[in-house]
Amino acid sequence: MKGRIELGDVTPHNIKQLKRLNQVIFPVSYNDKFYKDVLEVGELAKLAYFNDIAVGAVCCRVDHSQNQKRLYIMTLGCLAPYRRLGIGTKMLNHVLNICEKDGTFDNIYLHVQISNESAIDFYRKFGFEIIETKKNYYKRIEPADAHVLQKNLKISSPGQNADVQKSEN
């Protein structure tokens, strides 16, 4: 299936499309606050279009936790018939490019249902690693456990390592 993949802004005019996509793609339902927040994150939320049809979306937020600036991928998904066409890759690359241009993010992370092997494989291709598994993360879906996948964006500078070596001598 050949086609044109484009990313578009999420606006009050198309937020209902995002809601419908999320209802179909994800086993979890998102509340009104989720969608209100999505309208305020700018480039961190995008609808994905395949030949002008909305088929997927990515929604992220900036998270300041663990004394770090982190990007949290709340949702990234695509309708089943449109998977493996490069749409997820385009959405993830968009988010990674934002982080790279910004230059101040320590890492990017997300939760994935432990049974979702295709998602886990997808993120691993981009350098994400499973850093922990949260028991009973999801309510009302099975399996309820989620892996936390993370990609580190900051490489510790050589100067820091040199200091550590000096103090050991």
UniProtKB/Swiss-Prot annotation:
GO terms for molecular function: histone H4 acetyltransferase activity; protein N-terminal-methionine acetyltransferase activity; protein-lysine-acetyltransferase activity; protein-N-terminal amino-acid acetyltransferase activity. The gene is naa50. Keywords: Acyltransferase, Cytoplasm, Nucleus, Transferase. This is N-alpha-acetyltransferase 50. Residues 137-140 are annotated as: Substrate. GO terms for cellular component: cytoplasm; cytosol; nucleus. Belongs to the acetyltransferase family. GNAT subfamily. It is found in: Cytoplasm; Nucleus. Residues 5-154 form the N-acetyltransferase domain. CoA binds at residues 78-89, 116-125. Its main location: cytoplasm. One of its GO terms (biological process) is establishment of mitotic sister chromatid cohesion. Substrate binds at Y30, M74. SUPFAM superfamilies: Acyl-CoA N-acyltransferases (Nat). The active site is at Y72, H111. Its EC number is 2.3.1.258, 2.3.1.-. It comes from Xenopus tropicalis. It catalyses: N-terminal L-methionyl-L-alanyl-[protein] + acetyl-CoA = N-terminal N(alpha)-acetyl-L-methionyl-L-alanyl-[protein] + CoA + H(+); N-terminal L-methionyl-L-seryl-[protein] + acetyl-CoA = N-terminal N(alpha)-acetyl-L-methionyl-L-seryl-[protein] + CoA + H(+); N-terminal L-methionyl-L-valyl-[protein] + acetyl-CoA = N-terminal N(alpha)-acetyl-L-methionyl-L-valyl-[protein] + CoA + H(+); N-terminal L-methionyl-L-threonyl-[protein] + acetyl-CoA = N-terminal N(alpha)-acetyl-L-methionyl-L-threonyl-[protein] + CoA + H(+). N-alpha-acetyltransferase that acetylates the N-terminus of proteins that retain their initiating methionine. Has a broad substrate specificity: able to acetylate the initiator methionine of most peptides, except for those with a proline in second position. Also displays N-epsilon-acetyltransferase activity by mediating acetylation of the side chain of specific lysines on proteins. The relevance of N-epsilon-acetyltransferase activity is however unclear. Required for sister chromatid cohesion during mitosis by promoting binding of CDCA5/sororin to cohesin.
